[in-house]
């Protein structure tokens, strides 16, 4: 993804966040801090590509994407944290919290930007 695509997807996320998620305390990660993309924003953007037709994404795929901006990244944990801890409705194969898709242990899927993670409390 190039800078323009990242910004377009992030702006879409911001719109949905303001309309559906902010009221529940779901935190929107900053796109940039000190001129650099944040890892959390990049992971969220990558998971939201082609919304609402989002794809299942592996941890390895996320790590490769983040390495374009942070070359020394060894392991990306942000997808898991954005889900259960921050309220984004991201299913994880490790948590086995998706009943509609069969996800392996190292896969994630953004379910929707219109509802927060089930059971999330800010």
Question: Which residues make up each language-model segment?
Answer:
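Minor-groove-contacting beta-hairpin "wing" of winged helix-turn-helix DNA-binding domains
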Residues: 95-111
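Short acidic, hydrophobic short linear motifs in intrinsically disordered regions
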Residues: 53-67
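Short amphipathic alpha-helical interaction segments
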Residues: 70-85, 94-95
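Alpha-helix N-cap/helix-initiation sites
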Residues: 36-37, 55-59, 72-76
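General nucleic-acid-binding
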Residues: 1-8
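Short, amphipathic alpha-helical interaction segments positioned at domain boundaries
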Residues: 109-122
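Short hinge/loop at the helix->beta-strand junction immediately C-terminal to the helix-turn-helix recognition helix
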Residues: 88-89
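Short alpha-helical segments that sit at the start of domains
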Residues: 11-48
């Amino acid at each position: 993804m190039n800078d323009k695509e990242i910004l377009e997807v992030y702006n879409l996320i911001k719109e949905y966040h303001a309309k559906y998620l902010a009221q529940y305390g779901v935190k929107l990660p900053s796109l940039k801090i000190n001129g650099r993309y944040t890892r959390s924003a990049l992971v969220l953007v990558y998971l939201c590509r082609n919304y609402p037709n989002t794809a299942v994404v592996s941890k390895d795929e996320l790590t490769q994407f983040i390495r374009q901006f942070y070359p020394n990244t060894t392991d990306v944990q942000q997808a898991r944290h954005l889900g259960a801890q921050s309220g984004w409705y991201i299913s994880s194969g490790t948590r086995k919290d998706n009943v509609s898709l069969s996800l392996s242990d190292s896969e994630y899927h953004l379910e929707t930007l219109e509802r927060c993670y089930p059971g999330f409390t800010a």
